[in-house]
Amino acid sequence: MSDVTLSRASSEHVPLLLELVAEFCEVDQHPYDPARVTLALGPLLDDDQHGVVYLVNQDSGYLVVTWGYSLESGGREALIDEIYLRRRGEGLGGKVMGALFVDMAARGVVKMFLETETHNRRARAFYARQGFDEDDSIWMSREISATE
């Protein structure tokens, strides 16, 4: 397989991204709301302030990375919010991660995070091969309503 290309998605790619996100949600059995996804994509496609959306080899998949900042990490952090590849088990994922690490270093990222389900051993093994460690910390979340 040839080298991987990560290209920054733009607003013209929304139809393709919605198709890819729908596929991802179907595979991972997540709810899919195209209106919510379109709204969330907007700021990421407008500029890099909040993060970046990449297309993998134009239409082989997508990757969403968002920014954070931490004293503990010593600077800029990146969270792999979503990654979806149409074809798996062919080595593309490792190439995508390698290209992503190069781009993240160029953007000043000092630490990367991701979250995957506990039961997804295949994903956990893949991420471990890419150098990610399982932390002892626990992710917690809370929805924030517009009326708070």
Predicted feature descriptions by range:
Residues G68, R86-R88, E117:
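Residue-level recognition of the GNAT/N-acetyltransferase active site
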Residues A128-S137:
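Conserved acetyl-CoA-binding loop of GNAT-fold acetyltransferases
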